[in-house]
UniProtKB/Swiss-Prot annotation:
UniProt-recorded Gene Ontology molecular function terms: translation elongation factor activity
One GO cellular component, as annotated: cytoplasm
SMART domains (UniProt xref): EFP (SM01185), Elong-fact-P_C (SM00841)
Main location: cytoplasm
Organism name: Clostridium botulinum (strain Eklund 17B / Type B)
Protein's recorded name: Elongation factor P
Amino acid sequence: MISAGDLRKGVTFEFDGQVFTVTDFLHVKPGKGAAFVRTKLRNVISGGVVDRTFNPTEKLQEAVIERKEMQYLYSDGELYYFMDQETFEQIPLNAEKVEDAIKYLKENMFAVIKFFKGSAFSVEAPNFVELQITYTEPGVKGNTATNSLKPATVETGAIINVPMFVNDGDVIRIDTRTGEYMERV
């Protein structure tokens, strides 16, 4: 059992006979009245999103989730294909299940696929990835006195804010949990 006050982004639990993953949460302590937890939940089976408010002391049944590392192979436009390294079985997943992880995945990279009762419902990119910058505006000399950032497009198409000294062709490390630039490699 997990209490509603412990809900965080990515936690999966069973509620009202359905399984939900927390996509967003806010713990609210109003000046008057009791505290509550406002959440945005995604149904792992249907993909539907609901807003739900919980009392922080409310107990929820934690769902049993299987996590399996798989290799991202390719995309055919609508579906993304992942391969199990043990059985070599390929699993197609739609964009709704892949979510934001695809912004950081190149072909042949490994990602964690989450399963509930044998059905894949979510993809988790590695915490840190190294990607090459394909386009960014050149930094102007003298612009580096402050900690200013500029947008840069990486090889997967994601746009990341990077420091002024980063140029086209540089390889950078990105924290996929926050989408932030970490360092130049």
